[in-house]
Amino acid sequence: MSTVLLAVIAVILCVLFRILNVNSQAQKPLIFGRDKTFIENILFISPFLKNPYVPTRLWGFSGHVQTILHSLIGRVRCPWPIGARISLTLPCKSTLTYDVYEPVGSEHEDDVTVAICPGIGNTSESVYIRTYVHYSQCHGYRCAVLNHIGALHRIPITGTRIFSYGHTDDYGYMIGSLLEKYPNTKLVLVGFSLGGNLVTKYLSEERKRPPNIIGGISICQGYNAIDSLGYLLQWANFRRFYLYIMTDNYRNIITRHKRVLLSPELKLRHGLDENMIASAGTLPDLDEAYSRRVHGFETVTDLYRWSSCAFYMDNLKTPMVFINAKDDPIAAEHLLPFIRNFADSHDKVMYLELAHGGHLGFYEGGLFFANPVTWLDRALVGISGGLLMAHNKLSPKEIIMCSEEETATILIRGPYRH
C-alpha cells in the first residue's frame, strides 16, 4: 500500500512540476523593431526592459497559473484609487461612463493623461486596472479608464446596445471628453487584451484623431479574431476551457440587461432567439445568435474581420509599443508572427515578446507570494515615459509627418539586439 501511495504522490508531483513549468529559467524579453532611435528612447527611460523577467518562482513560469490567478485574484494587496466618474449621453442614447484619476505627489513638468481601455467586460473597478492606475498616479500620470457599456453592475444601460469587440466610437467619445476638460494634455493610449485591439484599431482607422496623442501601448491582444477564435476552439492545452469562461462572462452581461437587449421589439428587429443565446457553448455560437445580428453583419466571420485591428494596421502612423507573452493561453504564440513582422517593417513601432507572463499576469518576485506591483505595471509606466521622451525630441515638422506619412528607412530587422 505504501508503494502505491508513493507512486501516486510521485505522479502528482510530476504533473505539478510539468504544469508549473518550474524547470524554466528567467529570460530577457525579445525586442523587435527596425526604428533604432525610437527603441533606444524607450529603453533609456526603462532600462530594466533589457533585463530578464523573473516570475514568481514556484508558479510564475506557468502561463496557465498566471492567467488563472489574474482572473481570480488580480493583484496582491490591491489599492483602491479615488477618482471621479464622468457620464456621457451618446447620440444613440447610451450612457457611457469613464473614471478620471488625478496624479498624486509633487508637481510634474508634463501634463500627461493615460487613456486606458480595459479587457472584455472589464472596468475601472477591475483589480488589475486599479493597481496600474495607482502606480501610474504615483509617477505623475493622470489616468482615465473607459467603462465598457454594460459591464458595470450598478450602471443600467439606457440605449439598445452594449460594448462590442471592434466598436471604437465609445473610446473616441472618452478621448474627446478628456480633451474638453484638459485641452493641453498629452495622451498615451493603453489597451489591455480586447482593449489593446480597440486602441490599435482606433489609431489605425481612417478617422480624425486629436494631435494630443503621443503614442499607444497594447498588451496581450490577439490582433486577428478569426485566427484567435479558430485556435481557442481546439481542445488542446485547456483552450476550450478559456473560451467557455469568456463566453459565459459575455452571456452574463447580455442576460443582466436582457430587459432592454432582449426586448420583444429588438428580438423582432434583429431576429434574436433567446434560447439560442442561452445555450451557446462558444463565442462563435453566441456571436451567431446575438452579436453579428445586432451589429448588422451577414456572417460571424464578417463581424470578426471588421473587429480585428490586424486588417487596419497598415494605416497606423502613431508611435506604438506592443507586448505579448509566448505562454499566453488566450493570445497564443502562433498569433505572434504577425506582430513581429509588423514591427520589423514599420517605423516608430516596438514589440516586446516575453517567454512568460500568461494573459495579463506578469507577476514577479518572491518564492510563493508575488510582489504587489507586477512587471507589467512597471513596464507600462516606463514605456509611457519613453513615448513622452520620443515625442519631445521630435520637431513640429516631424510630428506632422508622423501623423500623415509613413517613412521607409529600414534600420533594424528581427529581434533588436541590445
Where are the predicted features?
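N-terminal cap/lid segment of alpha/beta-hydrolase-fold proteins
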Residues: 56-109, 369
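Short, surface-exposed "cap/lid" segments of acyl-processing enzymes
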Residues: 90, 101-157, 173, 177-180, ...
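Active-site nucleophile elbow and catalytic-triad environment of alpha/beta-hydrolase enzymes
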Residues: 289-312
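Catalytic active-site module of serine/aspartate enzymes centered on a nucleophile-bearing elbow/loop
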Residues: 355-357, 361-418
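Short beta-strand/loop motif that positions the catalytic acidic residue
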Residues: 316, 322-324, 328
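Alpha/beta-hydrolase active-site loop
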Residues: 161-182, 201
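Active-site machinery of serine-nucleophile hydrolases
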Residues: 133-150, 342-365
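Alpha/beta-hydrolase-fold enzymes
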Residues: 12-43, 47-48, 180-295
